[in-house]
């Protein structure tokens, strides 16, 4: 068994834990990891404490394959190669050279090193990286080519190795994912301020959508939320159409991987509930349609160009999951306040009894909707601190 670590955006740890539990990779009850209470009684979220930025779990390398294929809310899956104390450079190099690098690196494979040092005697990150690279060369008999890690290199990404030194305790991990897991392979067309697929999936999960009732995104942009919802409802794995770093490892089990993909393909369903995406930006709608086409779900989503005031929800109740404009996306604060007030008015007029989930960077804007949102979950989007919040649009009492 290996120690594995699912990296995720801070705030999304409970969702990653829930997914791992559903995959049988964590021996826990998902409801104990993320408890979402009814908004009618004052919604709140409770989660156990996690290491910020990820979930550690145990499994085989085959389990690492599965995690990469299925996880929707994680950014990477790391394999822990070793953990040891090192207070001197010779000690660091000696102990690093004992790790089984030959299982993960072909002799010609280039590497990239990501090093962080905190409260340790070895504090110079560049020097630590040099010793680790040297130790890999000691083990393999040939020093690896070391390159800078750049996500936009695509298939030419070097093998990423992550080194952390905290209080002289060194943890060395190797990345099994390659490109970040939010890169599903379908979003080539983008609109302004695109939403990462991992956060979009977390929003759909947090909403409590039952995958039976309709789902609407009235600020859909390039379509990430509708596409992720369609993939989720259709049981299409998040990584079904992409490559991973582990495919280049010397002992990659292609037979197991092919069987895993075949089983995943058999589980895909074509009949999914009504999903609607709308946006006033015609260019965004064109991008959304192109992305849905590449994801193979264009026939399952209805996109239309219309302002929030003109939305036409299907008979419900259903779910609204959306990422309205905020932060740097709109320069005029007054315009934002008016937009959020209008959003709330439209929800009360057209979506009574519907569940609403959204993210926003300012509590005051959330209040401007006039909807009874919960306190939500703090997380990040595009470098901004945001809150993922939920509400239920109440139906007026009849006398």
Feature annotation, model-predicted:
Residues 1-159, 399:
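Non-catalytic nucleic-acid substrate-recognition regions in nucleic-acid-modifying enzymes
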Residues 20, 113, 163, 323, ...:
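Residue-level signal for inorganic ion chemistry
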Residues 118-120, 179-180, 325-329:
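A short, flexible beta-alpha/helix-coil linker loop
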Residues 161-173, 389:
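C-terminal edge-of-domain segments
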Residues 172-206:
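SAM-dependent Rossmann-like transferase core, predominantly class I methyltransferases
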Residues 195-313, 329, 333-335:
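Conserved S-adenosyl-L-methionine
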Residues 304-310, 314-399:
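C-terminal catalytic and target-recognition region of SAM-dependent MTase-like enzymes
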């Amino acid at each position: 068994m290996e120690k594995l670590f699912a990296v995720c955006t801070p705030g999304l740890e409970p969702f990653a834990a829930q997914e791992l539990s559903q995959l049988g990779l964590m021996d826990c009850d998902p409801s104990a990891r993320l408890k979402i209470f009814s908004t009618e009684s004052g919604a709140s979220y409770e989660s156990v404490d996690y290491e910020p930025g990820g979930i550690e779990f145990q499994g085989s390398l085959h389990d690492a394959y599965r995690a990469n294929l299925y996880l929707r809310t994680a950014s990477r899956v790391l394999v822990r190669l070793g953990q040891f104390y090192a207070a001197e450079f010779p000690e660091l190099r000696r102990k690093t050279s004992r790790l089984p690098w030959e299982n993960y690196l072909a002799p010609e494979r280039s590497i990239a090193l990501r090093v962080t040092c905190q409260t340790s005697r070895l504090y110079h990150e560049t020097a630590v990286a040099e010793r680790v690279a040297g130790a890999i060369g000691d083990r393999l008999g040939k020093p690896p080519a070391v390159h800078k890690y750049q996500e936009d290199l695509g298939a030419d990404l070097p093998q990423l190795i992550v080194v952390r030194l905290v209080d002289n305790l060194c943890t060395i991990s190797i990345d099994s994912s390659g490109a970040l897991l939010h890169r599903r392979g379908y979003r080539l067309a983008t609109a302004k301020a695109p939403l990462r697929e991992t956060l979009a999936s977390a929003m759909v999960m947090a909403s409590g959508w039952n995958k039976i009732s309709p789902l609407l995104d009235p600020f859909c942009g390039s379509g990430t939320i509708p596409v992720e919802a369609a993939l989720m409802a259709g049981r299409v794995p998040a990584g079904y159409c992409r490559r991973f770093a582990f495919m280049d490892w010397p002992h990659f089990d292609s037979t197991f991987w092919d069987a895993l993909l075949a089983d995943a393909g058999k589980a895909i369903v074509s009949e999914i509930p009504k999903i609607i995406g709308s946006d006033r930006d015609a260019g965004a709608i064109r991008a959304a349609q192109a992305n849905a086409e590449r994801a193979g779900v264009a026939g399952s989503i209805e996109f239309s160009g219309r302002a929030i005031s003109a939305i036409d929800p299907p008979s419900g109740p259903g779910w609204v999951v959306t990422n309205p404009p905020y932060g740097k996306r709109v320069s005029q604060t007054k315009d934002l306040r008016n937009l959020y007030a209008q959003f709330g008015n439209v929800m009360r007029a057209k979506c009574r009894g519907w569940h609403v989930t959204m993210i926003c960077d300012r509590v005051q804007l959330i209040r401007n909707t006039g909807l009874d949102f919960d306190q939500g979950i703090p997380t990040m989007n595009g470098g901004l601190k945001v809150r993922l919040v939920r509400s239920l649009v109440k139906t007026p009492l009849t006398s």
